[in-house]
Amino acid sequence: MKKLYFSTFVQGLEKPVEAMLRKEGGVAVERVVPGAALYRSVREPAMPFVHQTFSVLFQMKPVAGVDDAVKRLLSSGGWLDRFPYEETQGKRFRIVTAMGDKLVAANMRYVDMLEKIICENTGMRTYRERPDVELWVLCRPEAAYFLWRLGKQSATRQEGQLRTDVCAVVSFLAACGAKNVTVLGCTNVSLPAALKNGGARALTCVCPDRASAKLIEGKLRGVRVCEGSSGYTDVADGSQQADVQHLPVKAEKTAGLESDLRNALFEARRILDADGRLIVIASLAHAESTLRKTQGVRMLARYDLTLSGQRSAIWVMTTKPTDVEESLIEQ
């Protein structure tokens, strides 16, 4: 029997995430909305391209706020049948209330009443400091949900690194399975790790300094790491099927930064084969103008999103000189 699940991800990546969900075995997508997807699955999902995943206990029509959602739960007991009772005995839980992607406070009198009902019917007990289970009352424009959160947030990120769920989407867009892939200007581990997990046959990381090269050498095995300029590498002409470039969005915009990106784009044209794919992740302020002016690359798709509070995008491009319209994501 397929259970109903709800997963969140970075808003702006709806199309690639939906395509990735549809490629998962045993998954039936019901709805994809900004920053989230509702789907059924025969097994508990563990997908690297989403941020948080929940089991859906109850769906409600849109409400004005979390207090209205909690009151509606109190007046309807149908959701009690959805609890996984084999997992509830002795578990500690807390209730989390949220509007969209922001946590908000609810009327504690209503929350206490909801906690009491759950304790009486499931064998769980409240423990707000260090719970085993989080039950979310989530209000969104399309619906209100009562959710059982599964596992922990999968999208870890260290300072200066991309979130792991974004990196997994980039790996999918690069179509790197069983292919030669190069990361130009590689300064973090999360991106090459996602490309390697995506099935890259041979992965080359060109790092701007020794510290970045040493970091990647210590974290990833089976990856060729070299130090040098992104605009001048020893990678053979036409030997790569994908090239990925990430410009840290909080870096200061300088003439040198623009020059480095321009040189890296020219280098990508040299090392990519005729069907190669070029992916750039950067803030609009850093890259939009340079990408628009660069000759010899053709835009396949652009996904606008927010990274580290900055308006950014993922550009998917090709060096293939053709006017024939291509489908980025094969259905």
Predicted regions: what they are:
Residues M1-N121:
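Non-catalytic nucleic-acid substrate-recognition regions in nucleic-acid-modifying enzymes
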Residues M1-G25, R31-E44, A105, R130-D132, ...:
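Class I S-adenosyl-L-methionine-dependent methyltransferase catalytic core
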Residues I117, M124, Q153:
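A short alpha->loop->secondary-structure connector
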Residues E120-V133:
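Active-site phosphate-binding and catalytic loops of NTP-dependent enzymes
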Residues G78-P84, Y127, A202, S229-S230:
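Short, solvent-exposed coil/turn linker segments
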